């Protein structure tokens, strides 16, 4: 049996949710091998998620749209990385860029382990003519399998990340505030994963108007025009879209929330990293493909189990073949009831 490597390069560039899913696997591995050095290369945006890091983990932000753009950028990156004298590469991405980097390291006789994404299984489970419907390996297990190929295992359990920042004064809970704080992240990258905005607005407004809840809405400045109008409807709605809080402050805020309502999205994963309960709404995609957040189960998911057409997509990027996204015909009342049940279950 070959000895375990001492200096490991870990590659996972994107997407944000997938990079977030690396943390519950990589952190325990790093802490189980304090004598070894780990370096993760990822996108500048995703690098901001890596807080409360193990001391032997270095996170390098690699901008593939600027200095590391294209084929030339891959060679530039390799020339820089080879100076670090890594003795193993864990490719958690398996796309053209990571394949090329891995190949260049192989030419230098560096040991490489690559993720099996289960692409064939995922195509089968989302096919109209699927012959089986079962839980596939989670991304967490697929990441762990890569480290296992390098002889790196751990029995350590992942613990939620420590709050990375102090909240600004206007986000501090006052002594007289007895409301339950709820987060809402109403967007994901693809239409097939987005709960209709009119329905989500009903959810947010109905919760806020009870006076029992304060609702914080997460989104980008591009979402502000829509979400700021929600804020104007009820006093207990706070839109964070134009606040420029940054990931660290948003992650710190999540630790103060009773629950986060999300899509199958990066915010689902970020909330679970902070140990915050989640209610996640799934449409075209399905937890069986392996992307459910850390520690979540079917009780955290709202979905249309009666539809045989779903999942029709692994990532939610395929247009609905019926044109109506019937998978998102989920009533606001059902979402509200599940949120209240989650909060009551927490406070009992």
Per-region residue spans from a language model:
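Catalytic machinery of carbohydrate-active enzymes
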Residues: 1-348
């Amino acid at each position: 049996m070959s000895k375990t490597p001492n200096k490991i390069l870990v590659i996972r560039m994107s997407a944000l949710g997938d990079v977030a899913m690396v943390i519950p696997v990589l952190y325990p591995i790093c802490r189980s091998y304090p004598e070894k050095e780990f370096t993760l290369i990822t996108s500048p945006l995703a690098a901001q998620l890596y807080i409360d890091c193990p001391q032997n983990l270095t996170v390098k932000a690699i901008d593939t749209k600027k200095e590391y753009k294209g084929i030339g950028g891959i060679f530039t990156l390799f020339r820089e990385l080879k100076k670090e004298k890594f003795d193993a590469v864990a490719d958690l991405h398996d796309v053209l860029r990571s394949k090329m980097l891995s190949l260049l390291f192989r030419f230098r006789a560096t040991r490489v382990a690559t993720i099996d994404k289960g692409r064939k299984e995922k195509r089968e489970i989302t096919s109209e003519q699927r012959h089986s419907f079962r839980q596939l390996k989670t991304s967490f297990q697929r990441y762990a399998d890569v480290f296992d190929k390098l002889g790196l295992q751990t029995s350590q359990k992942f613990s939620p990340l420590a709050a990375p920042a102090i909240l600004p004064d206007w986000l501090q809970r006052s002594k007289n505030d007895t409301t339950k704080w709820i987060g809402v992240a109403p967007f994901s990258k693809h239409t097939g994963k987005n709960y209709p905005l009119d329905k989500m607005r009903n959810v947010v407004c109905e919760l806020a108007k009870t006076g029992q809840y304060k609702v914080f809405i997460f989104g980008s400045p591009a979402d502000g025009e829509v979400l700021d109008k929600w804020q104007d409807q009820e006093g207990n709605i706070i839109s964070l879209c134009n606040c420029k809080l940054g990931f660290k402050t948003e992650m710190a805020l999540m630790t103060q929330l009773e629950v986060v309502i999300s899509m199958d999205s990066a915010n689902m994963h970020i909330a679970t990293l902070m140990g915050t309960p989640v209610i996640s709404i799934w449409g075209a995609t399905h937890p069986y493909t392996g992307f459910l957040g850390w520690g979540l189960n079917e009780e955290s998911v709202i979905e249309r189990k009666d539809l045989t057409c779903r999942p029709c997509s692994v990532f939610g990027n395929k247009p609905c073949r019926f044109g109506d996204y019937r998978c998102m015909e989920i009533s606001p009342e059902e979402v509200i009831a599940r949120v209240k049940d989650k909060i009551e279950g927490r406070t009992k």
